[in-house]
């Protein structure tokens, strides 16, 4: 990918009455509303179902179940940590160009075929209006992805140490040693996604814990990673009980950082 890549803000679609965009979004809302999604834990690219499930409901109608998610327990959390540490060995040595290429594809998928899925999921799961979903779930997440790529290139290419005659000074940017724990909020789709994305773009591996009330919409982002070709184990998806997961993860000796808002 071009190291001179420059990001631009994603244009906002207004979904005006009678438009094709509005028609396709309404069809996707109906599709998601009429079925229940079975949401697994994702560790090292594999779907894990513990059988210990919690419902995903519409915030304005708790009787409308959008799906059920499987909760990660201590065994799954340890598996996710092990997966992250193993994936780090390769991902931390993958070039920025290759990492950027994958996440640019995620941005392009959201801007294209996934836009209606993402917006509908945010509206149903988090209670966003159509305008809020378009701005937050689609445009801002696309912008996070694109600008993170630009900023990563800027960071890598803009600092050249001065080397006097007879000396050589070098500056190396490298990932953290260990794994990053990303804790997503319940009400901000794009920030929730970016908490996992931004460390990964610069070579870190991530345990991503979505908010219990926003697992449904977060899972759509996980599906995007797979389609974009993100290697297994770079981002592990661990929905579950916050205090239990937090106690186990925060006490681990290989924890390199916590990313939350």
Where do the PLM segments sit?
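Hydrophobic face of amphipathic alpha-helices that form TPR/SEL1-like repeat modules
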Residues: 1-66
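Glycine-rich loop-to-alpha-helix module at the N-terminal edge of alpha/beta enzyme cores
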Residues: 50-51, 55-57, 62-156
